[in-house]
Amino acid sequence: MLRILFGSLLLSGAMAVSTAAQNAPGVTDREIKIGQTMPYTGPGGWVSSLGQAEKAYMQMINDQGGINGRKINLISADDGYLLWRTGMETRKLIEVDHVAFTFGSLGTTTQLAVARYLNERKIPQLFIESGAYRWGNYKETPYTIGGVRPSYRLGARLYARYILRQDQNAKICILYEDSDFGRDYAAGVRDVLGDKYAATVKEATYEFTDPSVDRQIVELEASGCTALIAAMLPPLAVQTIRKVSDLGWKPLFFMNNVSASVPVVLEPVGVENCIGLLSYAYAKDPLDPTFEDDPGMKDWRAWMSKYLPGEDVRRPSFVNGYNSAATMVQVLKQAGDDLSRENIMRQATNLRDLELPMLLPGIKINTSPTDYYPVQQLQLVRFDGKRWVRFGDLVYDE
Protein backbone atom coordinates (compact mmCIF):
# COMPACT_ATOMS: atom_id res chain seq x y z
CA MET A 1 0.00 0.00 0.00
CA LEU A 2 2.82 2.36 0.91
CA ARG A 3 4.55 1.46 -2.35
CA ILE A 4 1.40 2.35 -4.32
CA LEU A 5 0.99 5.61 -2.41
CA PHE A 6 4.65 6.52 -2.90
CA GLY A 7 4.36 5.73 -6.60
CA SER A 8 1.27 7.90 -6.87
CA LEU A 9 3.09 10.77 -5.19
CA LEU A 10 6.00 10.41 -7.59
CA LEU A 11 3.62 10.44 -10.56
CA SER A 12 1.77 13.44 -9.16
CA GLY A 13 5.05 15.27 -8.64
CA ALA A 14 6.22 14.46 -12.14
CA MET A 15 2.97 15.76 -13.58
CA ALA A 16 3.34 18.99 -11.61
CA VAL A 17 6.88 19.47 -12.85
CA SER A 18 5.75 18.71 -16.40
CA THR A 19 2.91 21.25 -16.17
CA ALA A 20 5.17 23.93 -14.73
CA ALA A 21 7.75 23.24 -17.41
CA GLN A 22 5.23 24.17 -20.08
CA ASN A 23 5.49 27.82 -19.15
CA ALA A 24 8.00 29.80 -21.16
CA PRO A 25 11.35 30.86 -19.76
CA GLY A 26 10.96 34.11 -17.86
CA VAL A 27 7.59 33.11 -16.41
CA THR A 28 7.26 32.52 -12.67
CA ASP A 29 4.34 32.64 -10.26
CA ARG A 30 5.05 36.35 -9.82
CA GLU A 31 6.50 37.59 -13.11
CA ILE A 32 6.26 37.48 -16.89
CA LYS A 33 9.52 38.62 -18.43
CA ILE A 34 9.18 40.14 -21.92
CA GLY A 35 11.85 41.65 -24.18
CA GLN A 36 11.99 44.25 -26.93
CA THR A 37 14.52 46.26 -28.90
CA MET A 38 13.90 49.95 -29.44
CA PRO A 39 16.04 52.78 -30.87
CA TYR A 40 16.40 55.12 -27.92
CA THR A 41 19.48 56.56 -29.62
CA GLY A 42 20.71 56.86 -33.21
CA PRO A 43 18.75 57.57 -36.40
CA GLY A 44 15.54 56.07 -35.06
CA GLY A 45 15.55 57.96 -31.78
CA TRP A 46 12.59 60.06 -32.90
CA VAL A 47 10.30 57.10 -32.22
CA SER A 48 11.64 56.08 -28.82
CA SER A 49 8.37 57.36 -27.36
CA LEU A 50 6.86 54.04 -28.49
CA GLY A 51 9.05 52.18 -26.03
CA GLN A 52 8.34 54.75 -23.33
CA ALA A 53 4.61 54.30 -23.83
CA GLU A 54 4.74 50.51 -23.77
CA LYS A 55 6.79 50.46 -20.58
CA ALA A 56 4.47 53.00 -18.97
CA TYR A 57 1.39 50.96 -19.89
CA MET A 58 2.89 47.84 -18.34
CA GLN A 59 3.69 49.84 -15.22
CA MET A 60 0.01 50.80 -15.00
CA ILE A 61 -0.98 47.13 -15.29
CA ASN A 62 1.52 46.22 -12.56
CA ASP A 63 0.15 48.95 -10.31
CA GLN A 64 -3.28 47.38 -10.78
CA GLY A 65 -1.98 44.00 -9.62
CA GLY A 66 -0.60 42.56 -12.83
CA ILE A 67 -2.18 39.72 -14.80
CA ASN A 68 -3.37 36.74 -12.78
CA GLY A 69 -1.10 37.86 -9.98
CA ARG A 70 1.98 38.16 -12.20
CA LYS A 71 3.76 41.46 -12.78
CA ILE A 72 5.08 42.26 -16.25
CA ASN A 73 8.80 42.88 -16.53
CA LEU A 74 9.34 44.51 -19.93
CA ILE A 75 13.05 44.73 -20.73
CA SER A 76 13.43 47.37 -23.44
CA ALA A 77 16.93 47.33 -24.93
CA ASP A 78 18.39 50.16 -27.01
CA ASP A 79 19.49 48.91 -30.43
CA GLY A 80 20.25 52.32 -31.94
CA TYR A 81 18.32 51.22 -35.06
CA LEU A 82 21.45 49.32 -36.15
CA LEU A 83 21.20 45.78 -37.49
CA TRP A 84 24.17 44.40 -35.61
CA ARG A 85 22.94 45.84 -32.32
CA THR A 86 19.43 44.50 -32.90
CA GLY A 87 20.91 41.03 -33.34
CA MET A 88 23.16 41.35 -30.31
CA GLU A 89 20.45 42.74 -28.03
CA THR A 90 17.89 40.17 -29.18
CA ARG A 91 20.26 37.30 -28.46
CA LYS A 92 20.97 38.78 -25.03
CA LEU A 93 17.26 39.04 -24.28
CA ILE A 94 16.75 35.37 -25.18
CA GLU A 95 19.98 33.75 -24.01
CA VAL A 96 20.94 35.89 -21.01
CA ASP A 97 17.78 37.58 -19.76
CA HIS A 98 15.65 34.54 -20.67
CA VAL A 99 12.55 36.46 -21.72
CA ALA A 100 9.41 34.53 -22.62
CA PHE A 101 9.03 36.28 -25.98
CA THR A 102 9.61 39.60 -27.69
CA PHE A 103 6.97 42.29 -28.05
CA GLY A 104 6.76 45.65 -29.79
CA SER A 105 10.30 45.72 -31.15
CA LEU A 106 10.70 48.46 -33.73
CA GLY A 107 11.74 48.35 -37.35
CA THR A 108 11.10 46.43 -40.55
CA THR A 109 14.72 45.78 -41.52
CA THR A 110 15.95 45.29 -37.96
CA GLN A 111 13.22 42.81 -37.05
CA LEU A 112 13.58 40.94 -40.30
CA ALA A 113 17.21 40.42 -39.33
CA VAL A 114 16.22 38.48 -36.19
CA ALA A 115 13.00 36.82 -37.41
CA ARG A 116 14.71 33.61 -38.49
CA TYR A 117 16.61 33.34 -35.20
CA LEU A 118 13.37 33.68 -33.20
CA ASN A 119 11.24 31.47 -35.45
CA GLU A 120 13.75 28.62 -35.51
CA ARG A 121 13.53 28.60 -31.71
CA LYS A 122 9.73 28.97 -31.75
CA ILE A 123 9.93 32.18 -29.76
CA PRO A 124 6.98 34.53 -30.39
CA GLN A 125 7.93 37.82 -32.04
CA LEU A 126 4.76 39.74 -31.29
CA PHE A 127 3.25 42.96 -32.59
CA ILE A 128 6.36 44.35 -34.25
CA GLU A 129 6.23 48.14 -34.47
CA SER A 130 6.16 48.06 -38.24
CA GLY A 131 3.43 47.84 -40.86
CA ALA A 132 5.42 45.70 -43.28
CA TYR A 133 3.20 43.40 -45.31
CA ARG A 134 5.60 40.48 -44.91
CA TRP A 135 4.67 40.09 -41.24
CA GLY A 136 1.43 38.52 -42.42
CA ASN A 137 3.29 35.58 -43.96
CA TYR A 138 2.23 33.03 -41.35
CA LYS A 139 3.69 30.13 -43.34
CA GLU A 140 7.21 31.53 -43.59
CA THR A 141 7.39 33.11 -40.11
CA PRO A 142 4.68 31.44 -37.99
CA TYR A 143 6.00 32.95 -34.75
CA THR A 144 6.04 36.52 -36.06
CA ILE A 145 3.05 38.86 -36.16
CA GLY A 146 2.95 42.48 -37.25
CA GLY A 147 2.03 45.61 -35.39
CA VAL A 148 -1.25 47.03 -34.18
CA ARG A 149 -1.53 49.16 -37.29
CA PRO A 150 -2.62 48.73 -40.93
CA SER A 151 -0.03 47.38 -43.32
CA TYR A 152 1.85 49.91 -45.44
CA ARG A 153 0.53 48.10 -48.49
CA LEU A 154 -3.06 48.67 -47.40
CA GLY A 155 -2.33 52.37 -46.94
CA ALA A 156 -0.92 52.59 -50.46
CA ARG A 157 -4.03 50.93 -51.89
CA LEU A 158 -6.16 53.54 -50.15
CA TYR A 159 -4.05 56.35 -51.64
CA ALA A 160 -4.17 54.89 -55.16
CA ARG A 161 -7.93 54.44 -55.13
CA TYR A 162 -8.45 57.98 -53.90
CA ILE A 163 -6.16 59.36 -56.62
CA LEU A 164 -8.08 57.53 -59.33
CA ARG A 165 -11.40 58.77 -57.99
CA GLN A 166 -10.11 62.32 -58.39
CA ASP A 167 -8.54 61.75 -61.81
CA GLN A 168 -8.71 58.54 -63.83
CA ASN A 169 -5.79 59.80 -65.95
CA ALA A 170 -3.56 60.78 -63.03
CA LYS A 171 0.19 60.41 -63.36
CA ILE A 172 1.43 59.00 -60.05
CA CYS A 173 4.91 59.39 -58.59
CA ILE A 174 6.15 57.25 -55.71
CA LEU A 175 9.24 58.23 -53.73
CA TYR A 176 10.23 55.46 -51.37
CA GLU A 177 13.03 53.94 -49.35
CA ASP A 178 14.50 50.94 -51.15
CA SER A 179 13.56 48.46 -48.43
CA ASP A 180 10.59 46.30 -47.49
CA PHE A 181 9.10 49.37 -45.83
CA GLY A 182 9.20 51.47 -48.99
CA ARG A 183 8.57 48.70 -51.50
CA ASP A 184 5.28 47.91 -49.80
CA TYR A 185 3.95 51.26 -51.02
CA ALA A 186 4.84 50.50 -54.62
CA ALA A 187 3.25 47.05 -54.24
CA GLY A 188 0.04 48.55 -52.86
CA VAL A 189 -0.30 50.92 -55.80
CA ARG A 190 0.43 48.04 -58.17
CA ASP A 191 -2.36 46.03 -56.52
CA VAL A 192 -4.81 48.73 -57.61
CA LEU A 193 -3.42 49.57 -61.05
CA GLY A 194 -2.51 46.08 -62.20
CA ASP A 195 -1.15 46.07 -65.76
CA LYS A 196 -1.58 49.85 -65.98
CA TYR A 197 1.12 50.39 -63.37
CA ALA A 198 4.09 50.85 -65.71
CA ALA A 199 2.31 53.43 -67.85
CA THR A 200 0.87 55.33 -64.88
CA VAL A 201 3.61 55.36 -62.25
CA LYS A 202 7.03 56.98 -62.04
CA GLU A 203 9.19 55.57 -59.26
CA ALA A 204 12.17 57.06 -57.45
CA THR A 205 14.03 55.32 -54.65
CA TYR A 206 16.66 56.17 -52.10
CA GLU A 207 18.75 54.34 -49.53
CA PHE A 208 18.19 54.65 -45.79
CA THR A 209 21.66 56.19 -45.45
CA ASP A 210 21.15 58.85 -48.15
CA PRO A 211 21.42 62.35 -46.67
CA SER A 212 19.05 63.95 -49.19
CA VAL A 213 16.29 63.17 -51.69
CA ASP A 214 16.30 66.58 -53.41
CA ARG A 215 17.53 65.13 -56.71
CA GLN A 216 14.74 62.55 -56.82
CA ILE A 217 12.08 65.16 -56.07
CA VAL A 218 13.30 67.45 -58.85
CA GLU A 219 13.21 64.54 -61.31
CA LEU A 220 9.70 63.52 -60.25
CA GLU A 221 8.39 67.07 -60.54
CA ALA A 222 9.88 67.36 -64.03
CA SER A 223 8.16 64.13 -65.11
CA GLY A 224 4.76 65.80 -64.89
CA CYS A 225 3.30 63.85 -62.00
CA THR A 226 -0.06 65.01 -60.70
CA ALA A 227 0.06 62.89 -57.53
CA LEU A 228 2.96 62.12 -55.19
CA ILE A 229 3.14 59.33 -52.63
CA ALA A 230 6.09 59.59 -50.24
CA ALA A 231 7.15 56.60 -48.14
CA MET A 232 9.96 57.57 -45.79
CA LEU A 233 10.95 58.07 -42.19
CA PRO A 234 10.59 61.51 -40.54
CA PRO A 235 14.06 63.02 -41.16
CA LEU A 236 13.70 62.77 -44.95
CA ALA A 237 9.96 63.46 -44.79
CA VAL A 238 10.79 66.94 -43.49
CA GLN A 239 13.18 67.44 -46.41
CA THR A 240 10.64 66.16 -48.93
CA ILE A 241 7.80 68.44 -47.86
CA ARG A 242 10.16 71.41 -47.80
CA LYS A 243 11.57 70.68 -51.28
CA VAL A 244 8.12 70.18 -52.82
CA SER A 245 7.08 73.52 -51.33
CA ASP A 246 10.25 75.28 -52.53
CA LEU A 247 9.64 74.04 -56.08
CA GLY A 248 6.11 75.41 -56.03
CA TRP A 249 4.95 71.94 -57.00
CA LYS A 250 1.28 71.27 -56.19
CA PRO A 251 0.62 67.54 -56.64
CA LEU A 252 -2.00 65.61 -54.75
CA PHE A 253 0.50 64.85 -51.98
CA PHE A 254 0.35 61.81 -49.69
CA MET A 255 2.72 61.24 -46.78
CA ASN A 256 2.95 57.80 -45.20
CA ASN A 257 1.43 57.50 -41.74
CA VAL A 258 4.81 56.85 -40.10
CA SER A 259 5.83 60.42 -40.94
CA ALA A 260 2.56 62.21 -40.24
CA SER A 261 3.43 63.49 -36.76
CA VAL A 262 2.67 67.18 -36.28
CA PRO A 263 5.47 67.89 -33.77
CA VAL A 264 8.05 65.57 -35.36
CA VAL A 265 7.54 66.32 -39.08
CA LEU A 266 5.04 69.06 -39.88
CA GLU A 267 6.11 71.73 -37.40
CA PRO A 268 9.83 71.49 -38.30
CA VAL A 269 8.99 72.07 -41.98
CA GLY A 270 6.42 74.77 -41.18
CA VAL A 271 2.73 73.88 -40.89
CA GLU A 272 1.88 76.47 -43.54
CA ASN A 273 3.79 74.30 -46.04
CA CYS A 274 1.75 71.24 -45.10
CA ILE A 275 -1.79 72.47 -45.66
CA GLY A 276 -3.64 69.98 -47.87
CA LEU A 277 -1.18 67.15 -47.20
CA LEU A 278 -2.92 63.76 -47.12
CA SER A 279 -2.31 60.65 -45.05
CA TYR A 280 -4.35 58.02 -43.23
CA ALA A 281 -5.31 57.36 -39.62
CA TYR A 282 -6.43 54.39 -37.56
CA ALA A 283 -5.92 55.72 -34.03
CA LYS A 284 -7.52 58.62 -32.20
CA ASP A 285 -5.69 61.93 -32.45
CA PRO A 286 -5.37 63.93 -29.20
CA LEU A 287 -5.62 67.09 -31.34
CA ASP A 288 -9.04 66.10 -32.72
CA PRO A 289 -11.73 68.07 -30.83
CA THR A 290 -14.37 65.46 -31.65
CA PHE A 291 -12.71 63.22 -29.04
CA GLU A 292 -12.55 65.87 -26.31
CA ASP A 293 -15.23 64.14 -24.21
CA ASP A 294 -14.46 60.62 -25.39
CA PRO A 295 -14.04 58.25 -22.40
CA GLY A 296 -11.09 56.47 -24.02
CA MET A 297 -9.33 59.77 -24.68
CA LYS A 298 -9.95 60.92 -21.12
CA ASP A 299 -8.46 57.71 -19.74
CA TRP A 300 -5.46 58.03 -22.06
CA ARG A 301 -4.83 61.63 -20.98
CA ALA A 302 -5.05 60.62 -17.32
CA TRP A 303 -2.55 57.82 -18.00
CA MET A 304 -0.20 60.26 -19.75
CA SER A 305 -0.41 62.68 -16.82
CA LYS A 306 0.39 59.97 -14.28
CA TYR A 307 2.96 57.83 -16.07
CA LEU A 308 4.52 60.16 -18.66
CA PRO A 309 4.17 63.64 -17.13
CA GLY A 310 5.60 66.48 -19.17
CA GLU A 311 5.71 64.52 -22.44
CA ASP A 312 4.19 65.94 -25.63
CA VAL A 313 0.71 64.41 -25.91
CA ARG A 314 0.64 65.30 -29.62
CA ARG A 315 3.22 62.65 -30.49
CA PRO A 316 1.31 59.76 -32.10
CA SER A 317 3.80 57.22 -30.77
CA PHE A 318 2.35 57.61 -27.29
CA VAL A 319 -1.06 56.59 -28.64
CA ASN A 320 0.35 53.77 -30.76
CA GLY A 321 2.41 52.37 -27.91
CA TYR A 322 -0.65 52.47 -25.66
CA ASN A 323 -2.66 50.49 -28.22
CA SER A 324 0.11 47.95 -28.76
CA ALA A 325 0.59 47.34 -25.06
CA ALA A 326 -3.17 47.01 -24.50
CA THR A 327 -3.28 44.35 -27.21
CA MET A 328 -0.37 42.48 -25.62
CA VAL A 329 -2.11 42.54 -22.26
CA GLN A 330 -5.26 41.08 -23.83
CA VAL A 331 -3.20 38.19 -25.22
CA LEU A 332 -1.76 37.46 -21.77
CA LYS A 333 -5.21 37.60 -20.20
CA GLN A 334 -6.51 35.12 -22.76
CA ALA A 335 -3.53 32.85 -22.10
CA GLY A 336 -4.54 32.46 -18.45
CA ASP A 337 -2.09 30.26 -16.55
CA ASP A 338 -0.82 28.49 -19.67
CA LEU A 339 2.06 30.80 -20.49
CA SER A 340 3.88 28.43 -22.77
CA ARG A 341 5.27 29.99 -25.91
CA GLU A 342 2.89 27.85 -27.95
CA ASN A 343 -0.19 29.13 -26.13
CA ILE A 344 0.98 32.74 -26.14
CA MET A 345 1.31 32.51 -29.93
CA ARG A 346 -2.05 30.75 -30.12
CA GLN A 347 -3.75 33.59 -28.27
CA ALA A 348 -1.97 36.29 -30.29
CA THR A 349 -3.49 34.74 -33.39
CA ASN A 350 -6.97 34.36 -31.92
CA LEU A 351 -8.09 37.91 -31.19
CA ARG A 352 -11.76 38.50 -31.93
CA ASP A 353 -13.31 41.93 -32.45
CA LEU A 354 -11.01 43.51 -29.87
CA GLU A 355 -11.87 47.18 -29.39
CA LEU A 356 -9.25 49.48 -27.90
CA PRO A 357 -10.05 52.85 -26.31
CA MET A 358 -7.60 54.70 -28.57
CA LEU A 359 -8.44 53.15 -31.93
CA LEU A 360 -10.82 55.06 -34.18
CA PRO A 361 -14.49 54.19 -33.65
CA GLY A 362 -15.42 51.12 -35.66
CA ILE A 363 -11.91 49.70 -35.89
CA LYS A 364 -11.52 46.28 -34.30
CA ILE A 365 -8.55 43.98 -33.97
CA ASN A 366 -8.95 40.53 -35.45
CA THR A 367 -6.37 37.80 -35.96
CA SER A 368 -6.51 34.11 -36.73
CA PRO A 369 -4.01 31.31 -37.41
CA THR A 370 -4.21 32.29 -41.10
CA ASP A 371 -4.61 36.06 -40.69
CA TYR A 372 -1.68 37.86 -39.07
CA TYR A 373 -2.85 41.41 -39.86
CA PRO A 374 -4.31 42.82 -36.60
CA VAL A 375 -5.68 46.07 -38.07
CA GLN A 376 -7.29 46.11 -41.52
CA GLN A 377 -9.30 49.33 -41.36
CA LEU A 378 -8.21 52.94 -41.83
CA GLN A 379 -9.44 56.38 -42.85
CA LEU A 380 -8.11 59.20 -44.99
CA VAL A 381 -7.03 62.43 -43.29
CA ARG A 382 -6.09 65.89 -44.58
CA PHE A 383 -3.95 68.46 -42.75
CA ASP A 384 -5.70 71.82 -42.33
CA GLY A 385 -2.77 73.79 -40.92
CA LYS A 386 -3.44 72.82 -37.31
CA ARG A 387 -4.44 69.17 -37.22
CA TRP A 388 -5.32 66.14 -39.30
CA VAL A 389 -9.00 66.11 -40.27
CA ARG A 390 -10.66 62.79 -41.06
CA PHE A 391 -12.86 62.53 -44.14
CA GLY A 392 -14.64 59.84 -46.09
CA ASP A 393 -15.68 56.46 -44.75
CA LEU A 394 -13.72 53.96 -42.75
CA VAL A 395 -12.07 51.73 -45.35
CA TYR A 396 -11.70 47.97 -44.98
CA ASP A 397 -9.03 45.89 -46.67
CA GLU A 398 -10.26 44.26 -49.84
What spans do the regions from the language model cover?
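Hydrophobic alpha-helical segments within soluble ligand-binding/sensing domains
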Residues: 86, 147-171, 211-214, 237, ...
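Beta-alpha junction/loop-to-helix N-cap segments that form part of ligand/metal-binding clefts
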Residues: 23, 31, 46-52, 63-137, ...
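Extracytoplasmic ligand/sensor domains, especially the bilobed periplasmic-binding protein
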Residues: 99-204, 253-279
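A local structural motif
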Residues: 67-78, 97-100, 197-205, 224-227, ...
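Extracellular/periplasmic periplasmic-binding protein-like sensory domains
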Residues: 149, 244-320, 394-397
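Short, low-complexity disordered leader/linker segments with a strong preference
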Residues: 1-33, 397-398
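Extracytoplasmic "Venus flytrap"
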Residues: 24-31, 35-55, 77-84, 106-107, ...
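Segments of small-molecule ligand-sensing domains
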Residues: 306, 310-319, 329-388
